[in-house]
Amino acid sequence: MKKTISFLMIAAMAMIVSVSFTACSSDSDTSGNVEAYQEIVDNQVKAQKASSKKTKALLLVAFGSTWPEPFTDFDNTIEAYKSAFPDHDVYFSFSSAICRNRAAAGEHVEDLNAPKRNYYAPDIWLESLGRVEYAEITVQSLQVIPGEEYASVVACLKGFANNTKNDLRNEYLKNVKLRMGTPLMADPDEDVENLATELHKIYSQYANQGAMLFMGHGNPDDLDIFSANIRYTQLEIALQKKNKNYYVGTVDMMDNFKTDVLERMREAGYNSGKVFCAPLMSIAGDHANNDMAGDDDDWKFNEETGEYEDTSWKVFFSETEKVKNGYDCSDETMIVKGLLSYPAIRQLWINHTHTALNSEPLEWYHSNDGTE
């Protein structure tokens, strides 16, 4: 049943993406060196496939980051996937051009001693995998919900399947087995409950002391392509069945900003005490370090959204004068760790990959020359 649900879910998402997204492209890389990047990745893939002799490839796709801790989380995730899928060559990609460019430039080399890293776009990796003609290619999204970023990943794979660069053999594309692993909370029932269970194991020590807040990303209403913002609400409900002190808010979801979380806390009678915060994101990058745990205190109120957009969660929940919160919320109550840093949660993504591999291949191929 899980296999069937997953297959139907991806098929439905693909139909939506075909209307909302027409392409996934590396053209937004500001350096203009797309051809050079393609050559670099081509050489890496050729060398890997020649060495391993494997016929199956697995491409992990994260949004990306420029912070050192996420780099470590990504490295550990790659190694975990290599161990879990020894018959696959494992590759890794950033979907964000901004993150790719900034990581390559070494945005945090001086202030955080972060290394320069070269990551490449999913469409470049897929093109290279196709050029050496892997018999099976599985793409695993490392997103938390099936939102805007996941849509771009689906668009990448659809573009590859339909030979948008028009340089792969139609006979190959007709026969290659393509699969897609869904985000962490794709399914509203099993996925949400599985994540709630693992989060409770990790964070119950904090929920037992005070309010335990998770900051997700979310999508603005006009970009909530798969109506997946509701996963955050569903997760809060699942978590509160385990401990009433859990709350789940977001950066971008309307009616679920930190101001909305505060309102729910007050309605529940939690008006003082400790407030712990952790990112509900695959890694702890800019949002976790700045929007959640930073010192931004602009206090400019957006009347349309009802949010203090440039005030961090830490500052907001510790404020005593402007909004009279006065909770015990400080550097000591910030838990700046991404979900991929926890092996048990990383395993949930791996489970999604197993589900994809046990599902029927996606039937997305349509040749450019009119033949099937």
Residue ranges of model-derived segments:
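C-terminal motif of bacterial Sec signal peptides marking the signal peptidase cleavage site
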Residues: V19-A23
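Hydrophobic helical h-region of N-terminal Sec-dependent signal peptides
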Residues: M9-V17
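Bacterial N-terminal signal peptides that target proteins for export
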Residues: M1-I10
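Active-site-proximal alpha-helix that buttresses catalytic centers in soluble enzyme cores
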Residues: S26-E372
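A short hydrophobic/aromatic micro-motif that marks alpha-helical segments and, especially, helix-coil
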Residues: V17-S18, I78
